[in-house]
Amino acid sequence: MDAIILCAGKGERLRPLTENRPKPMIPIAGKPILQHIIEKVEDLVDNIYLIVKYKKEKIVDYFKNHPKIKFLEQGEIDGTGQAVLTAKDYVDDEFLVINGDIIFEDDLEEFLKYKYAVAVKEVKNPENFGVVVLDDENNIIELQEKPENPKSNLINAGIYKFDKKIFELIEKTKISERGERELTDAIKHLIKEEKVKGIKLNGYWNDVGRPWDILEANKYLLDKINTDIKGKIEENVVIKGEVIIEEGAIVKANSVIEGPAIIKKGAVVGPLAYIRPYTVLMENTFVGNSSEVKASIIMKNTKIPHLSYVGDSIIGENCNFGCNTITANLRFDDKPVKVNIKSKRVESVRKLGVIMGDNVKTGIQVSFMPGVKVGSNCWIGASCLIDRDIESNTFVYKRDELIFRKLK
């Protein structure tokens, strides 16, 4: 038994976070999405084939020493069907296929009982997904792609069990106008010829497609951690709840950490810093004097040195915040924060701060309005109020007129 994990997509709805990394490499609860998936499947299979393309070197470099993992590069044709077809000459007769951008709780042993199976999940908004219709024996009888009037509340959850017949059906599938070959089109042919079991997922499941999905999945996974403190803790530090502090991390004097939270190797907190629940500080980050971070993911090598507030935000790698940088995360009317996703204004959640790419620098007293996205490699000058998205490689600054008058 082998597994194929689909990791080739660009993750455009998650930009700017995916400008410098593939979506499966976005860290949630201290490790990439892809690592969470691999940990669910690695004991069940002999080989794990990662189908890579976009920013493939990030995936290869991170997982190159895993004994079961092999890398296959998807060709010019895009789409999930083409991604699966990439492994045609490598996998065993039976194999699992898993989307590389989902966080899920259920174990996968149930899938091994069937020749063909698709994971399904009951949701409140099936019209936003691919809908699955089952018969009385839980066999799939119909697939609908984002229908206006869904026939079911069950959706395709992105986990499959196939044999090599699926390759034959994928090859018969027409390439779409977008130049893609889709796996679901092949499954529509499969259900006409074979019984395909719909396996209902009962536990947590998250299709990580939007920035707030990352923060939601982060909360779910952090709720499962247990305290493990190996780093250096200075005097008068207060630690509450479940907190992981890795070896090589330092929490300086008079800081407060409220779990669940993870502080990775090389991170420095304090003195007098406040880390609130559902925060992850990745490797070599710095949250300094009188800075507060709440329910946020701070990626590697980012510095928030002093008198700053970051809430409900995702901050990329190698960012540096000037003194008194503030992220707002709540509207006055308490309605969901609106975010631009692929040129559309979308309602997110009640609290959402800033979504920031890599290598961003802010001057002193910079403020961000809720839901703002900042692209990679930006500079933001002192005293700016950022109330709209900033494209990558942009320098934003303001000019206030200074008036000089002679005193008598």
Swiss-Prot record:
This is Bifunctional protein GlmU. N-acetyl-alpha-D-glucosamine 1-phosphate binds at T80, G130, E142, N156. UTP binds at L6, C7, A8, G9, Q74, G79. Pathway: Nucleotide-sugar biosynthesis; UDP-N-acetyl-alpha-D-glucosamine biosynthesis; N-acetyl-alpha-D-glucosamine 1-phosphate from alpha-D-glucosamine 6-phosphate (route II): step 2/2; Nucleotide-sugar biosynthesis; UDP-N-acetyl-alpha-D-glucosamine biosynthesis; UDP-N-acetyl-alpha-D-glucosamine from N-acetyl-alpha-D-glucosamine 1-phosphate: step 1/1. Optimum temperature is 50-60 degrees Celsius. Activity is 22% lower at 60 degrees Celsius and 60% lower at 100 degrees. Thermostable. The active site is at H306. It comes from the Archaea. GO terms for biological process: UDP-N-acetylglucosamine biosynthetic process. The lineage of its organism: Archaea, Methanobacteriati, Methanobacteriota, Methanomada group, Methanococci. Residues 1-202 are annotated as: Pyrophosphorylase. Keywords: Acyltransferase, Multifunctional enzyme, Nucleotidyltransferase, Repeat, Transferase.
